[in-house]
Amino acid sequence: MEAALLYDYPLDALIHAYKYGGKLALARPLGAALAQSVARDVDVIVPMPLARGRLAERGFNQALEIARVVASDTRIALFPDACRKVAETPPQAALPWKERSRNVRRAFVCDADLAGRKVAVVDDVLTTGATLNELTRVLLRAGAAGVRGWVVARTAR
């Protein structure tokens, strides 16, 4: 797992404005910071999927918009539709840490042919790693040769 920055003030406020305030222009600097900090040893980039309901609410997938920038800056192929979130789950941030793994169990499906490919999953923030761990499990079952997590920020915990 590679994180560009620590999730702390003022970055936490910027990510919140981006994610919940519709400040899409922030995808460029957030994605650029991530692109500059990662080892470019993967074949494809897969954004963390967002459930349909949350996508309709928000109007965009924050991980996909960041992944577009990272893919462009690193010249690594982007597979935007490789995986889907098939379960409408409560937001991870609203749950106690111990419940987060259970919350995302069987939440993802990956239909893309990833056989033998090294995959980077791009997301905005990593806290417990439960969501990334579950998607990693699904990607490996789909044939990925390896999976790395690339996040803009991680919590100190």
Question: Can you annotate each of these PLM segments?
Answer:
Residues 1-121, 128-157:
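Conserved PRPP/pyrophosphate-binding segment of the phosphoribosyltransferase/PRPP-pathway fold
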